[in-house]
Amino acid sequence: MPKVGMQPIRRQQLIDATLAAVNEVGMHDATIAQIARRAGVSNGIISHYFKDKNGLLEATMRYLISHLGEAVKLRLQALSDHSPASRLQAIVAGNFDDSQINSAAMKTWLAFWASSLHQPQLNRLQQVNGRRLYSNLCAEFSRVLPQAEARLAAKGLAALIDGLWLRSALRGAAFNQAQAIALTTDYITFQLRGHTPP
């Protein structure tokens, strides 16, 4: 019989162990046994909580996505200026939060994206995450741009966020937050030029 209250602790241990294993050997080579050993639990615990490796990857991605949402939320709440430009910059900064650009997170995101092409449950999670980003960006651009322009600007900014992140991840280099913020700020400024919020 499992100890009462241990489930959240065990789940977090396994998520942390998954991030570490993916960072070291990649998702493909990270075995259930390696992850369990890193977490200091038996293989059966992974099956108990997550069913299989895909379930563990899904839980790990939900964890990263939760941190992403929290990073964006905190930046939006901290704003004193609620202009579309400031809110867009806060959304961008949340996407480039340390929780999303450390080596383990970046490698896990890459593994997730690759797996989501073949796993329907992971694909649904990716679609929800992608739509959320697009919707948030579109809502801010729509405050000052006509709907069609706002949609296009949101698609462009989402592509820029993902592209900057992906290029850094594939290079294996440390993510240059300052450069990414500067490039996305230039894009936002260009898209909003000549427009003021009502």
Swiss-Prot record:
Keyword hit for Transcription regulation: yes
Residue stretches in coiled coil: none
GO biological process, one term: glycine betaine biosynthetic process from choline
Pathway: Amine and polyamine biosynthesis; betaine biosynthesis via choline pathway [regulation]
Highest rank taxon of the organism: Bacteria
DNA-binding recorded as keyword: yes
InterPro entries (UniProt xref): BetI_C, DNA-bd_HTH_TetR-type_CS, Homeodomain-like_sf, HTH-type_TetR-like_transc_reg, HTH_TetR, Tet_transcr_reg_TetR-rel_C_sf, Tscrpt_rep_BetI
UniProt xrefs under Pfam families: TetR_C_6, TetR_N
Record GO terms (molecular function): DNA-binding transcription factor activity; transcription cis-regulatory region binding
Residue range(s) of DNA binding per entry: 31-50
Signal peptide bounds: none
Domain HTH tetR-type: 8-68
Entry keywords, A to Z: DNA-binding, Repressor, Transcription, Transcription regulation
Function: Repressor involved in the biosynthesis of the osmoprotectant glycine betaine. It represses transcription of the choline transporter BetT and the genes of BetAB involved in the synthesis of glycine betaine.
Protein name from the UniProt record: HTH-type transcriptional regulator BetI
Name of the encoding gene: betI
